[in-house]
Amino acid sequence: MMYKKQNLPELTLRGLVLGSILTIIFTASNVYLGLKVGLTFSSSIPAVVISMAVLSLFKTSNILENNMVQTQASAAGTLSSVIFVIPGLFMCGYWSEFPLWQTFMICLCGGGLGVLFTIPLRRTMVVESKLAYPEGRAAAEILKVANKDQSSKKGKQGIKEIALGSFIAAIFSLLSNGFKLAASESNFAFIWNKMAFGFSMGYSLALLGAGYLVGLAGAIALFVGMFLAWGIFTPYLSNFEFDSAKNAVDLASSVWSSKVRLIGTGAIAIAALWTLIELLKPVIEGIKEIVKNVKITNQEKNERTNIDLSLKSIFILFVLMVVGLFITFYSFVEDANLSIYYQMLFSFVGTLVSVLIGFFVAAACGYMAGLVGSSSSPISGIGLIGVIISSIVFLVLGVELFQDPMLSKFAVALAIFTTSVILATAAISNDNLQDLKTGHLVGATPWKQQVALLVGCVFGTLAIVPVLNLLYQAYGFVGAMPREGMDASSALAAPQANLMSTIAQGIFHHNIEWGYMAFGVFVGILMIIIDKILRRTQKMSLPPLAVGIGIYLPPAVNIPLVIGGILKYIVMQHLTKKYAKNSHKEEKLASCEQRGTLFASGLIVGESIFGVIIAGITVFSVSMGGSENPLALNLANFHDSELFALIFFVGVVLYFIKRIVKKDA
């Protein structure tokens, strides 16, 4: 850790102000993109770059202050994930307008609990584990390089690698997401013997960089999951859904989204549960470590990098969050005009389910973020698990009560409402451990980072609520329009919320296809067994969570990750042979690996920053009554966007290899 023994200013007023502004901007952009296409981007890395640029204007700025800004701003990309659930309250027909303070409290209390739940996990998952945490490491590398002596050869070279990767990714992002000259993905499918085989190739350079940081084990597991989904499950199941009126792409996509994705959810659920079982002992040890640190803090004042928020502070904040949740649940339940007994019962159980599941999900999400990165961690899959558990709990409690159609609608809404709290907790946990990893690598003070995370939750929440309401009033959601006569074609899809609403309604109306979920659990158990065998006999691994993720995520997301992981393995194997007889072998390999890490980090930076810029331009254009694609060139004679994207992507891969292999270390 670079600055472990230095006491530099970390939580500063200017840093908090800058972090708050970035949080609001990134959150607004993420809410729009998430509702439109079901995706959000991590704001940590662009926050690092912007923070360095702004704070460099002050002579007294330092690496730890920059780290606090990105820690605070990271709440934007993750807390906005609640949009994967909340629109479901409109889609099931329960809400017709946003109760602003209820939505505010969901985000604030859920996000706050996510921060608190990661505290006992920090030492276990961040300090002592070997998890990759790709975005966390990337942010740390950027901070380190930017704070090195700029006159040194290595410092200048590091900045060059980041800048070059950023520039390339930014150009492609502009061509793809802005000008619409390059496709973001290509879809292929064919039908053989009434079975649909599908495949999609994504061209995201940020995911290519993230795959490089994830490495080979995660890449292979993702590929296995993807092969199971699109090489076996989808073709087999499509045989029973065959419709000659549908083309191959539509048939394969519909089968995957409606059935195979449920298999992935089942696999993720059992893999996450197994992860929790394996982590139970170290988590308990982590909690004991906090108690130990509280007792000896006065004896170890110099060990600031080991100090979390005090147990007293955690307890007070926890109680405040739980009380706030109970009041919010009571307000929600009160609208259903139930007896006081059921009002208190559902309020208490909703709060209890949110807190208990939230804690266990926090551990699982932290592990997933370390394994495949926050950008690829299937938060919506966690949401599906949450909505299923919540629905079953409430169904058991009010099985007779919910025979009434109106109360059945309330039950669906209550399950979705509870899931939104769980998802807010999970989303923050998913990214917070990335931030704490960054802090650990640069020597930040944990308790100060945890304060910055809580501040980020507050300002992220302040942005989410009004933006969410504004977009709903302007466009509506698919199947839930705020006014009659609106153009349904412009409605925001909110795909994850639609799926969760469907599942909740299916449970209460007894028409969900549980068989696919159960089969997914079987697949997950099989992967756990294979992983255990490989670890014991071959010194290899096949992370079962990553296999489930490979089934759940579309190939357009998986493929760049897989390519990045394989690319790193091939390059490092080549370099190991190249420097086998070199007396400075380890130094040479470390230098090459760092160069690759920095270039990969640059790819993530460039695409992330331009994602923010283009999202901001889009939101501004739409709010002014303009186009949803204000930068699109709309060239009538240009029909080769997919070929152009493929050539660009392959060119970047080849250039990536050249930067690492052929350049003198």
Regions found by a protein language model. Name each.
Residues 1-665:
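Alpha-helical multipass membrane-protein architecture
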